[in-house]
Curated annotation (Swiss-Prot):
Protein's cellular compartments: Cell membrane
Listed name of the protein: Protein AaeX
Highest taxon above the source species: Bacteria
Family that this chain belongs to: Belongs to the AaeX family.
NCBIfam families: PRK11594.1
Keywords carried by this UniProt record: Cell membrane, Membrane, Transmembrane, Transmembrane helix
HAMAP family named in the record: AaeX
Membrane topology annotation: Multi-pass membrane protein
Main localization category: membrane
GO cellular component, one term: plasma membrane
Pfam family, one: DUF1656
Lineage: Bacteria, Pseudomonadati, Pseudomonadota, Gammaproteobacteria, Enterobacterales
TM region positions: 3-23, 43-63
Length: 67
């Protein structure tokens, strides 16, 4: 059970996980923007897979912090 309430916008109800997804997407873009110039992507074998795993980790952290 989440602490966040149901989010209603223009008559549409969104579950609390929607807010967590948006927050984690913004944090993911921030982390990716920091990691790109650092050269970490030169060491990564599959950048798309790395980005997916990074987003999953960020989403997990956000969802654990908001529960």
């Amino acid at each position: 059970m989440s602490v966040l309430p149901v989010f209603v916008m223009f008559g549409l109800s969104f579950p609390p996980v929607f807010i967590e997804l948006i927050i984690s997407l913004m944090l993911f873009w921030l982390v990716k923007r920091v990691l790109t110039p650092s050269g970490i992507y030169d060491l990564v074998w599959h950048p798309a897979l790395f980005n997916t795993a990074l987003y999953c980790c960020v989403f997990y952290l956000v969802s654990r912090l908001l529960v």
